[in-house]
């Protein structure tokens, strides 16, 4: 019997502010295989005990409110409440704690990332007893994973569709991202694909603006795509951005892309929303389209170290909602610690089973069972001289996405694409021959230059 229930049974109902820890802090609780587990970084206001802070998070993100209410007696709090079952201080940080919270599975609608986030990262983030709150990680139980379709196709099916194996895929974002006419945009797409890239991409800013309406862009990009395929004998793709102001308009664009025969569409899953994203992912599976996901707006959520949500949580949510690719940044030139953290959530995107590893920021063991994997897209300021490191770090199941690193070539777009492809194939060949790309990468690229513009 909970403390609140005991109070009503023994001395009657008493109104007033209650300490959350009386009901929601349960250090003796043994987590269940069906619980959703969350690790929160809590920065409390001064003078509030850690147990009360952790319990407040559990309460306000599940069944609790600031006082006991009459209707508590009409349900079973012990069955439905979230529980803060462990609290630990954050090493090297003053007045920060990791609070572990377990949520019963019955609190969440099946197959709905929207509902899951509404509860776990909803109003609790504005709770005035906390100076800051960050969701570091989630453990999604198998029972909940199985209620999601996940990625429309997954890594192996994509490779089979493209008939491309044994190397990373190459992409390029068309620049300038705004201002080109549809015909000139299609010309750049053709030159990049003809030069040797596997994919080109709409920038996330490109939807349907006065200078280039979506239907015109789709038509010219499809023409460029099929022309490049015919001339190279390779399957090509262009990420046609279907993101729109309404779900109905988004679906209309996806349907038109399918009717054109293009293999892949794109969605901005954070600005578009998880409900729209899951709807599009279901359509893509049913109709044979691959789905590329951009993460525009992620830094608003994940950039602060003590407030918001870590990108590994957004990555897990995307795998559940559905997407075949997602941008994951790049670790080239970063500190080793950041590299480990990045590769931690890359593994959470690709692998079926990931062990707990706090050194890589993974707070819980995650079993995805049969949910397909997502290909991480390495992008942001990369060029051919990064190719050895990118090949070694991200491996074959990745997309290496260049923008200025292709279109900024002094000889033009097509030579830029050729340079990317030559550098990639040289690095893959050197790796397969047993050469150390970390030590010899620059030499490998220099040797390949004689075959490339």
UniProtKB/Swiss-Prot annotation:
Domain of life from the UniProt record? Eukaryota
Instruction: Note whether Oxidoreductase occurs among the keywords.
Output: yes
Location in the cell reads: Plastid, Chloroplast
Cofactor(s) for this UniProt protein: Mg(2+)
Database matches in InterPro entries: RuBisCO, RuBisCo_large_chain_AS, RuBisCO_lsu_C, RuBisCO_lsu_C_sf, RuBisCO_lsu_fd_N, RuBisCO_lsu_N_sf, RuBisCO_lsuI
**GO process terms (BP):** photorespiration; reductive pentose-phosphate cycle
Recorded GO MF terms: magnesium ion binding; monooxygenase activity; ribulose-bisphosphate carboxylase activity
Q: What is its EC number?
A: 4.1.1.39
* Cofactor stoichiometry and binding remark: Binds 1 Mg(2+) ion per subunit.
As for PTM, the annotation reads:
The disulfide bond which can form in the large chain dimeric partners within the hexadecamer appears to be associated with oxidative stress and protein turnover.
What keyword terms does UniProt attach to this protein? Acetylation, Calvin cycle, Carbon dioxide fixation, Chloroplast, Disulfide bond, Lyase, Magnesium, Metal-binding, Methylation, Monooxygenase, Oxidoreductase, Photorespiration, Photosynthesis, Plastid
Q: Where is the active site?
A: 175, 294
Residues with PTM N-acetylproline: 3
N6-carboxylysine occurs at 201
Propeptide feature: residues: 1-2
- List ligand-binding residues for Mg(2+): 201, 203-204
Instruction: Tell me where the signal peptide lies.
Output: none
Chief location: plastid
Q: Which reaction does it catalyse?
A: 2 (2R)-3-phosphoglycerate + 2 H(+) = D-ribulose 1,5-bisphosphate + CO2 + H2O; D-ribulose 1,5-bisphosphate + O2 = 2-phosphoglycolate + (2R)-3-phosphoglycerate + 2 H(+)
Matching entries from HAMAP family are given as: RuBisCO_L_type1 (MF_01338)
Q: Which family does the record claim for this protein?
A: Belongs to the RuBisCO large chain family. Type I subfamily.
Miscellaneous comment: The basic functional RuBisCO is composed of a large chain homodimer in a 'head-to-tail' conformation. In form I RuBisCO this homodimer is arranged in a barrel-like tetramer with the small subunits forming a tetrameric 'cap' on each end of the 'barrel'.
Q: How does it assemble?
A: Heterohexadecamer of 8 large chains and 8 small chains; disulfide-linked. The disulfide link is formed within the large subunit homodimers.
Instruction: State the function annotated in the UniProt record.
Output: RuBisCO catalyzes two reactions: the carboxylation of D-ribulose 1,5-bisphosphate, the primary event in carbon dioxide fixation, as well as the oxidative fragmentation of the pentose substrate in the photorespiration process. Both reactions occur simultaneously and in competition at the same active site.
Matching NCBIfam families? PRK04208.1
Q: From the Swiss-Prot or TrEMBL record, give the protein name.
A: Ribulose bisphosphate carboxylase large chain
Q: Which organism is it from?
A: Hydnophytum formicarum
Q: What gene is this protein a product of?
A: rbcL
């Amino acid at each position: 019997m909970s403390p609140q229930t005991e109070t009503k049974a023994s001395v009657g109902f008493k109104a007033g502010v209650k300490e959350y820890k009386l009901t929601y802090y349960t250090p003796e609780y043994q987590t269940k295989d069906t619980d959703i587990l969350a690790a929160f970084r809590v920065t409390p206001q001064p003078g509030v005990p850690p147990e009360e802070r952790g319990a407040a998070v559990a309460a306000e993100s599940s069944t609790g409110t600031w006082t006991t209410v009459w209707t508590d007696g009409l349900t079973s709090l012990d069955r439905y409440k979230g529980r803060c079952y462990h609290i630990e201080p954050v090493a090297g940080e003053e007045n920060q704690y990791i609070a572990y919270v377990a949520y019963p599975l019955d609190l969440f609608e099946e197959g709905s990332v929207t509902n899951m986030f509404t509860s776990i990262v909803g109003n609790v983030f504005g709770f005035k007893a906390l100076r800051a709150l960050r969701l570091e990680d989630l453990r999604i139980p198998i029972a909940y994973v199985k209620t999601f379709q996940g990625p429309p196709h997954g890594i192996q099916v994509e490779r089979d569709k493209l008939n491309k194996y044994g190397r990373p895929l190459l992409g390029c974002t068309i620049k300038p991202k705004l201002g080109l006419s549809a015909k000139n945009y299609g010309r750049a797409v053709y030159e990049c694909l003809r030069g040797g890239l596997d994919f080109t991409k709409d920038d996330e800013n490109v939807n349907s603006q006065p200078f280039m309406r979506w239907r015109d862009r789709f038509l010219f990009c499809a023409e460029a795509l099929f022309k490049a395929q015919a001339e190279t004998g390779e399957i090509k793709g262009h990420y046609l951005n279907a993101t729109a102001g309404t779900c109905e308009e988004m679906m209309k664009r996806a349907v038109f892309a399918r009717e054109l025969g293009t293999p892949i569409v794109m969605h901005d899953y954070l600005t578009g929303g998880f409900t729209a994203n899951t709807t599009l992912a279901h359509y893509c599976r049913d109709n044979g389209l691959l789905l590329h996901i951009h993460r525009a707006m992620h830094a608003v959520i994940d950039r602060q170290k003590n407030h918001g949500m870590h990108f590994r949580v957004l990555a897990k949510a995307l795998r559940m909602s559905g997407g075949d690719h997602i941008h994951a940044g790049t670790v080239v030139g970063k500190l080793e610690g950041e590299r480990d953290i990045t590769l931690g959530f890359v593994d959470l995107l690709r692998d079926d089973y990931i062990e707990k590893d706090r050194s890589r920021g993974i707070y819980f063991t995650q079993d995805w069972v049969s949910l397909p994997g997502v290909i991480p897209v390495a992008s942001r300021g990369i060029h051919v001289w990064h190719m050895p490191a990118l090949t070694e770090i991200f491996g074959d199941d990745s997309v290496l996405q260049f923008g200025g690193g292709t279109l900024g070539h002094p000889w033009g777009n097509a030579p830029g694409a050729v340079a990317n492809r030559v550098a990639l194939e040289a690095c893959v060949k050197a790796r397969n021959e047993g050469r150390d790309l970390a030590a010899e990468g620059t030499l490998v690229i220099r040797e390949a230059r004689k075959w490339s513009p």
